[in-house]
């Protein structure tokens, strides 16, 4: 990778420390394979961004899926991070007057980005959107902050409100006769976050998971939990909801999940929102409206992927997402939102590569993998 001197753009508040000219990152090689580089330049933040020193990162399925499906040689990998603010852009200072150099923050960015190669959280330094950052209260660790990240909340804003069209929010929850909402994949980090937001928004969240994760999912807010491996899973959900189920969020999105989710609807149908490309051959019910969402689109920037994952730039979506992050900040500050359980993996950047292999093999359940890239600030 080429080396270039590090210098912040004009108008940025001075960095809290002297910045190196190079950093260690994990980026895609010529074949898309995740590879450690020790000579990568620091990212150059835009005026609405802040520069963050990365302390810890969490690993998501998309961190191995995107390089595999959409190789982008040179693109840095990783989405979620927690760290310390080093410098603040002039526009960022205007829109986030609460941010200060030295603040502990967490957020998410578009890793494996073919049109913005330096964007990736598996780096010692990250340029992040100021309005999509959360400040970490003292009671939360950097590991918990990395699990909070930002990609989960970006995904859930689009899934629950832009796609499913839910009206109740944590700021204005439903008051009367709350309807059920199914979260398929309730023990994932996105699942437990969705359940908490739904409960705080006045809905009746129900979920699927493995039985050994029932307590975790109930604690997140599910009023009823169903075993997705049961042959009667869909029928049990339909019976429990008395045919009232109209909203389904499928976090897993495979053939099994799609079949079960579709069968939970009554003849009236409803809206099925998923996070991966669904199988068209299973979309046999006209009364069920399906939509795949891409959480990365919350940035408002173009998503230059393919096969249905591409999105045009949408500044209005970015503005609405930023408002939702303000709501999440309040919930975190008030202790009303609990981060997903963490599992710390040692080894720094080598540990991140190990975590990618763990996720590929399906070696996690009910926990989020976290790696510290800076052990001086645990």
Curated annotation (Swiss-Prot):
Binding residue positions for NADP(+): 62-65, 187-190, 210-213, 228, 275-276, 364-365
Gene Ontology MF annotations: nucleotide binding; oxidoreductase activity, acting on NAD(P)H
Positions of substrate binding: 151-158, 295-299
SMART domains the UniProt entry points to: PKS_ER
Pfam families found in the cross-reference section: ADH_N
Swiss-Prot/TrEMBL induction comment: Expression is positively regulated by the oxaleimides biosynthesis cluster-specific transcription factor poxB.
Subunit structure: Monomer.
Name listed for the protein in its UniProt record: Trans-enoyl reductase poxP
Naturally occurring in which organism (per UniProt): Penicillium oxalicum
Gene: poxP
């Amino acid at each position: 990778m080429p080396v270039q001197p590090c210098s912040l753009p004009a108008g940025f508040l001075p960095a809290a420390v002297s910045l190196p000219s190079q950093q260690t990152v994990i980026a895609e090689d010529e074949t898309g394979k995740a590879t450690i580089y020790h000579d990568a330049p620091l990212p150059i933040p835009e005026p609405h961004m802040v520069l963050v020193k990365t302390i810890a990162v969490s690993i998501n399925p998309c961190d191995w899926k995107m390089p595999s499906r959409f190789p982008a040689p040179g693109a840095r990998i990783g989405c979620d991070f927690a760290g310390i603010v080093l410098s603040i852009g002039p526009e960022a200072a205007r829109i986030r007057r609460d941010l200060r150099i030295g603040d502990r923050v967490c957020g998410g960015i578009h890793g494996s980005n073919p049109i913005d190669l330096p964007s990736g959280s598996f780096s010692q330094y990250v340029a992040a959107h100021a309005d999509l950052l959360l400040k970490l209260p003292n009671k939360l660790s950097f590991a918990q902050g990395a699990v909070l990240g930002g990609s989960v909340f970006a995904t859930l804003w689009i899934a629950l409100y832009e796609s499913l069209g839910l009206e109740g929010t944590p700021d204005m929850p439903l008051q009367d006769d709350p309807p059920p909402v199914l979260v398929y994949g309730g023990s994932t980090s996105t699942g437990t976050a969705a359940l908490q937001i739904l409960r705080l928004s006045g809905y009746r969240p129900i979920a699927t998971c493995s039985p050994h994760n029932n307590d975790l999912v109930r604690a997140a807010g599910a009023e009823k939990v169903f075993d997705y491996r049961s042959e009667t899973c869909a029928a049990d959900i339909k019976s429990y909801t008395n045919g009232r189920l109209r909203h389904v969020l499928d976090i897993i999105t495979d053939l099994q999940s799609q079949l079960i989710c579709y069968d939970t609807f009554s003849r009236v149908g409803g809206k099925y929102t998923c996070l991966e490309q669904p199988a068209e051959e299973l979309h046999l019910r006209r009364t069920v409206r399906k939509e795949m969402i891409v959480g990365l689109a919350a940035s408002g920037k173009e998503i230059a992927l393919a096969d249905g994952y591409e999105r045009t730039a949408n500044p209005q979506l970015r503005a609405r997402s930023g408002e939702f992050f303000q709501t999440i900040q309040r919930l975190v500050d008030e202790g009303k939102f609990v981060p997903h359980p963490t599992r710390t993996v040692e080894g720094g950047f080598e540990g991140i590569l190990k975590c990618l292999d763990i996720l590929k093999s399906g070696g996690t359940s009910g926990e989020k993998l976290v790696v510290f890239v800076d052990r001086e600030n645990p």
